[in-house]
From Swiss-Prot:
The lineage of its organism: Bacteria, Pseudomonadati, Pseudomonadota, Gammaproteobacteria, Pseudomonadales. NCBIfam families: lipid_A_lpxD, PRK00892.1. GO terms for molecular function: N-acyltransferase activity. InterPro entries: Hexapep (IPR001451), Hexapep_transf_CS (IPR018357), LpxD (IPR007691), Trimer_LpxA-like_sf (IPR011004), UDP_GlcNAc_AcTrfase_non-rep (IPR020573). Homotrimer. It comes from Pseudomonas paraeruginosa (strain DSM 24068 / PA7) (Pseudomonas aeruginosa (strain PA7)). This is UDP-3-O-acylglucosamine N-acyltransferase.
């Protein structure tokens, strides 16, 4: 049976530096949305579009800004940024199991691998020759840590994560199930129509505080390492090809594809399904909207999009039909421009006579 986590509202307020408006001894046993919260839940209002749910919410207390709290009759924790406060408090209610330190008897650890005594190695995990596992690292069941790979302190690997050889991971990195780090990059040379394989002799280097989602793949470099900066956040099912460089604190949503040798700056955001061609550069502070295909370098910060927005199917079909007519329309427009120029030129000549 799952035990109940419980904190007083005052304890939660102290954790995030909030001002309590109401009963500081109120017990809180979980977090929930405004629509779903009950009397034992703490909720939050961060997005104005959900303000309409605040008056009728059954939440025991709500994280609010001072402005929103002034008109609220219920119990509140007043903070400058409710969403950040919610993020901090979420860890208090996280029920993710914490593995005990030690190596499971079914795990296979090479004689010359180094595993910190405070680390946890799960059932049937494999740690190959020369690998180094830092303090407090948790390695889930059936993970494979390749030769000479390094995992920094506080790392967490869900079950069935694969690190190939020579992968260097910084501190406090979380990797979800199915991720493959350090697979061979897609490198081939064409000889008279036949593809000859290029050995991928680089590695992968990942900074501190990185999160990597389920079934995401990061290929090793052809010569130098593929580089993932500090604080990068990668969603599920992302493909990062060989030699890619991603700057600090950049975030990518699911199904992004980054082609080889692309460079992405710091503090960028790539929405779901974005694709980048290879050998281009994206500067810092760029936001790319969902399903955009980036085919050239971006040198100025800002928001970028491509493709067509959603519209009713019948209208979309008409738009698609017009796209097929663009070449003919352009040709006809050029003809009209030439005729107009001729008429204008003729008129000017007549007025001069």
């Amino acid at each position: 049976m799952m035990s109940t986590l419980s904190y007083t509202l005052g304890q939660l307020a102290a954790h995030v530096g909030a001002q309590v408006r109401g009963d500081a001894d109120l017990p809180i046993q979980g977090l929930a949305t405004l629509q779903e919260a009950g009397p034992a839940h703490l909720s939050f209002l961060a997005n104005p579009q959900y303000r309409k749910y605040l008056p009728e919410s059954r939440a025991g207390a709500v994280l609010l800004t001072a402005a929103d709290a002034d008109g609220f009759a219920g119990t509140a924790l007043v903070v400058a940024n409710p969403y950040l406060a919610y993020a901090s408090l979420s860890h208090l209610f996280d029920r993710k199991p914490r593995a005990a330190a030690g190596i499971h008897p079914t795990a296979i650890v090479a004689a010359d691998a180094e595993v910190d005594p405070s680390a946890s190695v799960g059932a049937y995990a494999v740690i190959e020759s020369g690998a180094r596992i830092g303090a407090g690292v948790s390695i889930g069941a059936h993970c494979v840590i390749g030769a000479r790979s390094v995992i920094g302190e506080g790392g967490w690997l869900a079950p069935r994560v694969t690190l190939y050889h020579d992968v260097n991971i910084g501190a406090r990195v979380s990797i979800q199930s199915g991720a493959v780090i350090g697979g061979e990059g897609f490198g081939f040379a064409n000889e008279k129509g036949v593809w000859q394989k290029i050995a991928q002799i680089g590695g992968v280097t990942i900074g501190d505080d990185v999160e990597i989602g389920a079934n995401t793949t990061i290929d090793r470099g052809a010569l130098s390492d593929t580089l993932i900066g500090n604080g990068v956040k990668l969603d599920n099912q992302i493909m990062i090809a060989h030699n890619v460089q991603i700057g600090d604190h950049t975030a990518m949503a699911a199904c992004v594809g980054i082609s080889g040798s692309a460079k992405i700056g710091r503090h960028c955001m790539l929405a779901g399904g974005v694709g980048l061609v290879g050998h281009i550069e994206i500067c810092d502070n760029v936001f790319v909207t969902g399903m955009t295909m980036v085919t050239r370098s971006i040198t100025e910060p800002g928001s970028y999009s491509s493709g067509t927005a959603m519209q009713p199917a019948a209208e979309w079909k008409k738009s698609a039909a017009r796209i097929r007519q663009l070449d003919d329309m352009a040709r006809r427009l050029q003809q009209l421009e030439k005729r107009l120029a001729a008429v204008t030129s003729s008129g000017d000549a007549s007025s001069d006579a």
